């Protein structure tokens, strides 16, 4: 909770208490990886890499030096900007799946790489995003019944600000014009 609360001093102190009490390096590292994803998320995507690297390094190095590696990761995660947008996104998506069941995937997204797929319309009118400006094209990705739903809503902290701005910009630009593939793109 001290990492979530952005208190590196408390995070390192409680790490020391857990180590002193004999808690396993594996358990501590696992909790750090969870915190990096659950509480930091895309506000600082590097936090998960730091936690995973610390877990691997601490396991390989062993105690007593593993405590230094874990302290470095705990301090980093505690000081990182925070976001729980991924937690909220998956919770909302899981609830939607529970409520709506197994909705059909839009036919243009369905696998077209097998004999008979064309007869079923699979892949027909699929637009390859990399053929379009900004590598983005407006098309239905969610089941039609969920059209317009937003599960992931980036927050206003750290890197999520850039994610939000990027998504708004490419959607705005795509909405302004009729989208055609870039020159040289396959159709």
What are these regions (language model features)?
Residues 1:
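Active-site flanking loop/helix segments enriched in acidic
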